[in-house]
Structures are given as C-alpha cells and as structure tokens.
UniProtKB/Swiss-Prot annotation:
Family: Belongs to the TrpC family.
HAMAP family associated with the record: IGPS_B
Protein's GO biological process: L-tryptophan biosynthetic process
Protein name, entry field: Indole-3-glycerol phosphate synthase
Pfam families according to UniProt: IGPS (PF00218)
Keyword entries, A-Z: Amino-acid biosynthesis, Aromatic amino acid biosynthesis, Decarboxylase, Lyase, Tryptophan biosynthesis
GO MF annotation terms: indole-3-glycerol-phosphate synthase activity; phosphoribosylanthranilate isomerase activity
Native organism: Albidiferax ferrireducens (strain ATCC BAA-621 / DSM 15236 / T118) (Rhodoferax ferrireducens)
Catalysed reactions listed for this entry: 1-(2-carboxyphenylamino)-1-deoxy-D-ribulose 5-phosphate + H(+) = (1S,2R)-1-C-(indol-3-yl)glycerol 3-phosphate + CO2 + H2O
CDD domains cross-referenced by the UniProt entry: IGPS
C-alpha cells in the first residue's frame, strides 16, 4: 500500500480504536446480533439481471479524495428515494468521515427512506466494523483485497455471513482476484480505479473478467460516466455496476441513473 490508501488505512485504525473505547466490542456485537431481517443484496442484483436489466448499485457519496466535494445539496434520504424510483437494484453509502465526508448516519437515513438493500462502503480492517455495520442496518459490506491479507478477508467474511450480510470483495489486479476467489461470496467487484494512484481505466474490468468463474457475479466499479461506457461494458457481458460520482454531480441522481442505464 502506498500514498492515499496507506493514509486512509492509518487513519482508519485510529478511528477503530477510538470507536472501541467508546463502545466495546461485546456491546457492539450484541447490538449487531439483535438486528433481524437483512434485505437480500445478492438477490436484488440477480433479480435485475434475470429480468434483462442492468443491476445498478447506486452510490451515495458526498466527497472523494481525488475530486473533492461532489455534491453540496446532500440529503441521503432524498437521494436514496430518487435512486429507488429510477431503477437502482441496491444502494452503496460511503461512511468514511475523514476522506469521503461520510458517516454511519447517512447509511441509516438512506436505508430508512427506501426498500433497497444497502452496502456499507468503507475501509474494513477489523471485526468491530463488521458488527458495527450490521448494528447500523447495513445489508452488505465491502472488503478491499488491497488492504487485507487472506486470513483477514476470510475472518471478516465469516462474521458478515454469520450476521446474514452479503460481502462484496473488491479487487484491482489478477493476484487480488485470485485471493478473492478463495472466499465464499459470489460478489466480485472489479475496481477500475487504482486505489494507490486513483487513476481509472475500464480496461481493468475487461481484462480481469476473463479469469472470473461463471458462478461469480461481477460488479464493475468506477469509471462509468457515459452511455458509451455502459454499452461497452454490456457488450463484454458486464451487467452489474457500482456508480456514484456520475450521479452525485447530477441535479437529480435518480434521473441520471435512468438516463445512463436506460432503466426508465
């Protein structure tokens, strides 16, 4: 890890320690285990695909390290409703504070305002965060292969599965993909953005998807901005996408989704 990602991880470790000091692991785990009825994230994606529609994980993100503030008029509940009304399969909510100006309350607000399953998008390093995710209502969590070793990925996935949460494991290169395929989750996110440099290329998905077994569901992440991008990926057999920035900059995020993916 280098540069931006290394900084994010260092800050995240401090945040986790502070969170545990405020509320111990045993208490957070009890809260998580008392939650019932997750919304089925994988089924929501598969349902769209089975109907011949693009399965879009629509992201709620106020800011990013590379682009700064994406949306000043930022009301997560309204954005979530707009996404749901315009054909999104699921939501992704950024909860990292320091680098993305997110928070857990944004996830709670988004989930309360619509029926869609919600992914907590953050930098997961510790079991505490998985329990925290379920306690705040998340239906799925993101695991980033670049910041976790094999044992950590398997442990965090096992905890998520024990809480009936889905896991989206994110990769950027062939070695990371090989490691991700050791997990049980069917969801493999190929991030076209290099988290070490924040450079983006859709060729990342087109190259790595050749190594993906048929029983896994590929989610194309980052770099989808135009209808041509969607058509290019669709022609290659990609039918699930995670998109945020393109929608966050639009006056109506849900309408932007419908126009980009022709879901209207």
């Amino acid at each position: 890890m280098t540069d931006i990602l290394e900084k994010i991880v260092a800050v995240k470790r401090q945040e986790i320690a502070a969170a545990i000091a405020r509320k111990p692991l045993t208490a957070m785990r009890a809260d998580a285990e008392s939650r019932v009825l997750t919304r089925d994230f994988v089924a929501a994606l598969r349902g769209k695909i089975a109907a011949g529609q693009p399965a879009v994980i629509a992201e709620i993100k106020k800011s990013s390290p590379s682009k700064g503030v994406l949306r000043e008029d930022f009301i997560p509940a309204d954005i979530a409703q707009s996404y749901a009304e315009h054909g999104a399969a699921c939501l992704s909510v950024l909860t990292d504070l320091q680098f993305f100006r997110g928070c857990i309350d944004y996830l709670k607000q988004a989930r309360a305002s619509c029926p869609l399953p919600v992914l907590r998008k953050d930098f997961m390093l510790d079991a505490y965060q998985i329990y925290e995710s379920r306690a705040c209502g998340a239906d799925a969590v993101l695991l980033i292969a670049a910041i976790l070793d094999d044992a950590q990925m398997k442990d965090l996935e096992a905890i998520a599965r024990s809480l009936d949460m889905a896991v989206l494991v994110e990769v950027h290169d062939a070695p990371e993909l090989a490691r991700a395929l050791q997990l049980k989750t069917p969801l493999i996110g190929i991030n076209n953005r290099n988290l070490k440099t924040f450079e983006v290329s859709l060729d990342t998905t087109l190259t790595l998807m050749r190594e993906l077994p048929a029983d896994r569901l590929l989610v194309c992440e980052s770099g989808i901005h135009t209808r041509d991008d969607v058509l290019r990926m669709g022609a290659a057999g990609v039918n699930a996408f995670l998109v945020g920035e393109a929608f966050m900059r639009a006056p109506d995020p849900g309408l932007a989704l419908a126009e980009l993916f022709a879901t209207a």
